[in-house]
Amino acid sequence: MSHRYIPLTEQDKNEMLNSIGAKSISELFDDIPTDILLKRNLNIAESEAETILLRRLNRLAAKNTTKETHATFLGAGVYDHYTPAVVDAMISRSEFYTAYTPYQPEISQGELQAIFEFQTLICELTDMDVANSSMYDGMTSFAEACILALSHTKKNKIVVSSGLHYQALQILHTYAKTRDEFEIIEVDLKGTITDLEKLEQLIDDNTAAVAVQYPNFYGSIEDLEQINNYIKDKKALFIVYANPLSLGLLTPPGTFGADIVVGDTQPFGIPTQFGGPHCGYFATTKKLMRKVPGRLVGQTQDDEGNRGFVLTLQAREQHIRRDKATSNICSNQALNALASSIAMSALGKQGIYEIAVQNLKNANYAKNKFEEHGFEVLKAQSFNEFVVKFNQPIKNINLKLAEYGYIGGFDLGEVSDDFKNHMLVAVTELRSKDEIDDFVTKAGELND
C-alpha cells in the first residue's frame, strides 16, 4: 500500500517495474558482471524510533569540542563574539532566507534595501565612499582589491606585509598564477609589526599597491599614517585589510588615506562555523567606484517620486560582459551580509564601541596575567589578539588545555619557523576574568 509521505513502497516498485517490462530490480543490473556485483544486503542497522535516534545523535555531538563546551581563546581570523538574538530571528524570515537577487532585481525591494543598508554601514565603519554588496570572505576581498589596483594603475607589483593573514597571502599567490607579469613582494616583520624601513625601500614607481592588515595577523596595530606617507609619492594604491569590529575603536583606514578597505564581517552576527561561510566587505574611494567587483545597490526614485533601490553600474558585472567584467564574482553573501547588518544595527555605534573597548581591556588584562606568570608577551600595540612565547610545542599545550575545558590559541609555528612555540591568543568580550585567570594559570603549569 502506498503511503502519502513515504516514497518507494513495494507497490511503487512493482508499478514501475511493470511499466518498463522488467520482472525484478536485479534484472535492471544484468549488464553488470556478476563477479563484481554485490549479492548481499548492505550492512546497515535497522531503523530506530525518532526519539532514540535523536538521543544517539546528541551523544555523538557531545563528544565534540565546541565554544559551548569550552571557553575559547582561538582567533586568527574567526572570533567568538556576542550575537544579538534578533539576528537569527530576522535572517530566518522566509523573505530573506530563501531570497535570491534576480536579474530583474527591482521586484525584490526588501532584499535590495537590506544590501543598501549593509553598504552604508560598511562605509561608516571604514570612512570610505563606496562599498559593494559583499564578497565571499575577507581573503577573497583582499585578492580582488589587489587585482583592482593592478588594473587601475597599469603597474605590475604588489607590495604586501608579511603581517597579513597567511591564507590571504596564499589566495593572492593563487590569483597571481593566472595573470602575466604580476609580482608579489612580501615585506618582513620587525617583531610582529611590518618593518617600515624595508617597506619604504621596496616601494617604487612600478608599485601598483601596498597592502597591510589592521590589526595584523599577529594582533599588532600597524602605523597606517606613516605607511600612507610612503605610498603617496609613488602614486600607488593603499589597501588595508581591517577587522570591522576594531574600527569601532581604532581610527578607520579611510581617515589615514586608504584607497581600498577590505575585510570580513564575521565578528558581526556570523558564528564560528567550521570553514565558513563568512562575508567579505569591499570599500573604496569614489574614484574607484566603477572598478569595484561584485554588485552595487543604489538608491533612486520611481516615476511617482517614491524611494526605491536598484542594482547600479551593472556594466561592470560578468553577467553583462563577462570578458571585460571587473571581476567574475556573481552571487554574493547576501544572507550573511544581512546578519552582519542586523547585528551592527542592533548594537548601534555606541554598542560597537563598547564591545571593542571590552575586547581591548580583556586582551590587556590577559597580557598582564601572562607576564605575571613569567611568559614572554611580544611587545606591540594590539586590539584583541597578541603573541605569547611558550617553552613547549603549542600543539601539546593545546591538547592539555582542552582537557581543562579551554580551546587554546593558534599555533603560529604552523605558518612560520620564526614563531615556533608561539601562541596567538585571542580574547574577546565573551571571556570573563575568571576564565582568563584560570586559562593563564593552567597554561603556566603546562609550560613548566
UniProtKB/Swiss-Prot annotation:
Keywords: Oxidoreductase. Pfam families: GDC-P (PF02347). The glycine cleavage system catalyzes the degradation of glycine. The P protein binds the alpha-amino group of glycine through its pyridoxal phosphate cofactor; CO(2) is released and the remaining methylamine moiety is then transferred to the lipoamide cofactor of the H protein. NCBIfam families: PRK00451.1. The glycine cleavage system is composed of four proteins: P, T, L and H. In this organism, the P 'protein' is a heterodimer of two subunits. Belongs to the GcvP family. N-terminal subunit subfamily. It comes from the Bacteria. One of its GO terms (biological process) is glycine decarboxylation via glycine cleavage system. Transmembrane segments: none annotated. It is an enzyme of class 1 (oxidoreductase). It comes from Staphylococcus epidermidis (strain ATCC 35984 / DSM 28319 / BCRC 17069 / CCUG 31568 / BM 3577 / RP62A). It catalyses: N(6)-[(R)-lipoyl]-L-lysyl-[glycine-cleavage complex H protein] + glycine + H(+) = N(6)-[(R)-S(8)-aminomethyldihydrolipoyl]-L-lysyl-[glycine-cleavage complex H protein] + CO2. Its EC number is 1.4.4.2. This is Probable glycine dehydrogenase (decarboxylating) subunit 1. Gene3D superfamilies: Aspartate Aminotransferase, domain 1, Type I PLP-dependent aspartate aminotransferase-like (Major domain). GO terms for molecular function: glycine dehydrogenase (decarboxylating) activity. HAMAP family: GcvPA. The keyword Oxidoreductase applies.
